[in-house]
């Protein structure tokens, strides 16, 4: 099994193969990807769709001297396997294992780290220009999907690249007609307009009826139809940017890919190759439902993904999705916005029930935020559902277009904190710090499912921009209450009171997901725990009361310490005059790698044991560690 694949330790081995061996190699590589992902979990559909393209690129180009930049990067498993990491696939996305995305520190073949969308053309152009300035004769290649091409950054790069006539730059559009959510907007409609016109559809149907008795001729007509799709675009779009457009060609046909790429190597100036692929190619279940198989956990390939036998705890994403539908039912002004993450953000049901109030703006976070601001000026109640890591891409719009004008936009910030297998590129480590410094913002962090629901309701009532952050995955198991209750603005709550005497009284001020482990630590130490709820406005009154009645304060957040929620507590304490020693716990000042979320939190000292250990070492000097009975306040 994998007889050919076992002989490939790097692309030089690949280039020694006879062309006739490449398709059998592709079959083995596709089977290996499927087997590997089924055992570790990871991105599947996209990787099954890039097998032949990956082989062709490494076969034709002299990698790593020629540079390949993979946009988004979750489709790089075939690339990793062919570049010396075949045996490492068993550790994919696991702690101390190989990343699910390209990483420069992992391999010289990973020429540029990616994970966020639409960055590849800019990076590849920089490499092409840099190589020219250094006197190096090499190609720089950007592989970008049709979903990523909807983002403004991709067109900014193309606009810049088009005037670089001597750059050895190749942009490959991997057109699979499906990003995570279906591509949207004028560009994708433009690509499809010729093929969906009434006259064209009627003519095609008539021709197919006539040619149905001649299958070879019908197949020729279908191929001509595919090429007609490409005829519309170059003259009006890609070539207007200064690129030489080639395609579309079948991205699964090595006999088409390899000669085309070999010809492109002889050309100068920016080249644009349009390849058509299919997500899930070669695995019928993934072909039929590429969204389901976009990022599965472990599964049996023979049976496919099966629903969980026992109902799991409700995820925070589900809590958000249910709240949004309930809020929209009560208020016709509520609208939902997602930057191409309908499934991931829990908006599938909302789209079905309220299609006229659902806006998928594509991979366009900047536009999403300013679009929401515009809606707010007309009296609507926009809710932007966005991952913490992707909100970073729209920071200027958040400040300039929303906060500066004090517009009532709700930001439902998913994937806050560590995200596990996706690693540092997708972690929501910075939102508390970069949000709390913005005037007019209200910022909340949910500690359980019901609190998340009620915070979202509270956010919708505010006259200013408001953010609610919540983590990836399942909640604590707390039931959500259907009835809405507005949480008092800027008010936390004490969840546990210490019974320790003066000199040993510790108060833990916990935010969001850190409330549960802080309570566990407090049980071991007999400490007070406050669920702070609000990062901005911080509950200054509660902070000062705890400072006055305790000897030590500890702040705990699942975010960066510098400028974060703990800093807000320290500022409030200092202003109150009752200064106490403070220990600020949070994510370390480094990028936290991929792995099991619970293990990562423990590694960062943010589980119950880690929090207790840090407090003992800092304040209690290893003495009096026996806890008295817990005293929690409802």
Swiss-Prot record:
SUPFAM superfamilies: Thiamin diphosphate-binding fold (THDP-binding), TK C-terminal domain-like. InterPro entries: Dxylulose-5-P_synthase, THDP-binding, Transketo_C/PFOR_II, Transketolase-like_Pyr-bd, Transketolase_BS, Transketolase_C, Transketolase_CS. GO terms for cellular component: cytosol. One of its GO terms (molecular function) is 1-deoxy-D-xylulose-5-phosphate synthase activity. Its EC number is 2.2.1.7. Keywords: Isoprene biosynthesis, Magnesium, Metal-binding, Thiamine biosynthesis, Thiamine pyrophosphate, Transferase. Belongs to the transketolase family. DXPS subfamily. Homodimer. Catalyzes the acyloin condensation reaction between C atoms 2 and 3 of pyruvate and glyceraldehyde 3-phosphate to yield 1-deoxy-D-xylulose-5-phosphate (DXP). This is 1-deoxy-D-xylulose-5-phosphate synthase. It comes from Burkholderia thailandensis (strain ATCC 700388 / DSM 13276 / CCUG 48851 / CIP 106301 / E264). The lineage of its organism: Bacteria, Pseudomonadati, Pseudomonadota, Betaproteobacteria, Burkholderiales.
């Amino acid at each position: 099994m994998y007889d050919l694949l076992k002989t490939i330790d790097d692309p030089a081995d690949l280039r020694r193969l006879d062309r006739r061996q490449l398709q059998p190699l592709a079959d083995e590589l596709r089977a290996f990807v499927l087997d590997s992902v089924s055992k570790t979990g990871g991105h599947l559909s996209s990787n099954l769709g890039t097998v032949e393209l990956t082989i062709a690129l490494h076969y034709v180009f002299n990698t790593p001297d020629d540079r390949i930049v993979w946009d988004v990067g979750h489709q790089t498993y075939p690339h990793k396997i062919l570049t010396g990491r075949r045996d490492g696939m068993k550790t994919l996305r696991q702690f101390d294992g190989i990343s699910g995305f390209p990483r420069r520190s992992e391999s010289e073949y990973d020429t540029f780290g990616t994970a966020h969308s639409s960055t590849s053309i800019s990076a590849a152009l920089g490499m092409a220009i840099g190589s020219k300035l250094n006197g190096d004769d090499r190609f720089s290649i950007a592989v970008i999907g049709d979903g990523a091409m909807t983002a403004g950054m991709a067109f900014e790069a193309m606009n810049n690249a088009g005037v670089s006539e001597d750059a050895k730059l190749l942009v490959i559009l991997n057109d699979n007609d499906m990003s995570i959510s279906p591509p949207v907007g004028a560009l994708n409609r433009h690509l499809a307009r010729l093929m969906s016109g009434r006259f064209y559809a009627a003519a095609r149907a008539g021709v197919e009826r006539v040619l149905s008795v001649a299958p070879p001729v019908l197949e020729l007509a279908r191929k001509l139809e595919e090429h007609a799709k490409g005829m519309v675009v170059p003259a009006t779009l890609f070539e207007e940017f200064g690129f030489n457009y080639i395609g579309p060609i079948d991205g699964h046909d090595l006999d088409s890919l390899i000669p085309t790429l070999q010809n492109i190597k002889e050309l100068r100036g920016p080249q644009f190759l349009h390849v058509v692929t299919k997500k899930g190619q070669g695995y019928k279940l993934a072909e039929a439902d590429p969204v389901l198989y976009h990022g599965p956990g472990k599964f049996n390939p023979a049976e496919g993904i099966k629903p969980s036998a026992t109902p799991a705890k409700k995820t925070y994403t589900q809590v958000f999705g249910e709240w949004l539908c309930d809020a929209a039912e009560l208020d016709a002004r509520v609208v939902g916005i997602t930057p191409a993450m309908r499934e991931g953000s829990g908006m599938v049901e909302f789209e079905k029930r309220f299609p006229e109030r659902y806006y998928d703006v594509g991979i366009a976070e900047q536009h999403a935020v300013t679009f929401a601001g515009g809606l707010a000026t007309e009296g609507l109640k926009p809710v932007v559902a966005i991952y913490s890591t992707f909100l970073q891409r729209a920071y200027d719009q958040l400040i300039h277009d929303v906060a500066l004008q004090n517009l009532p936009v709700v930001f439902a910030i998913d994937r806050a904190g560590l995200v596990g297998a996706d690693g540092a590129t997708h972690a929501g480590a910075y939102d508390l710090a970069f949000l709390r410094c913005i005037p007019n913002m209200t910022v909340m962090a949910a500690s359980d499912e019901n609190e998340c629901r009620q915070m979202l309701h509270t956010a919708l009532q505010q006259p200013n921009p408001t953010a609610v952050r919540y983590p990836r995955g399942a909640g604590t198991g707390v039931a959500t209450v259907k009835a809405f209750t507005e949480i008092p603005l800027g008010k936390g709550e004490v969840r546990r009171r210490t019974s320790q005497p003066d000199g040993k009284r510790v108060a833990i001020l916990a935010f969001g997901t850190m409330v549960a482990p802080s309570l566990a630590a407090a049980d071991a130490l007999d400490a007070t725990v406050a669920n702070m709820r609000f990062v901005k406005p911080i509950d200054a009154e509660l902070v000062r009361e705890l400072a006055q009645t305790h000897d030590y304060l500890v702040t705990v957040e699942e975010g960066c310490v510098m400028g974060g929620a703990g800093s807000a507590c320290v500022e409030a304490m200092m202003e109150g005059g009752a200064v106490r020693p403070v220990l600020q716990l949070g994510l370390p000042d480094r990028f936290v790698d991929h792995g099991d979320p619970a293990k990562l939190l423990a590694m960062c000292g943010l589980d119950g044991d880690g929090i207790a250990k840090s407090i003992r070492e800092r304040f209690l000097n290893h003495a009096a560690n026996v806890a008295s009975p817990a005293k929690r306040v409802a």
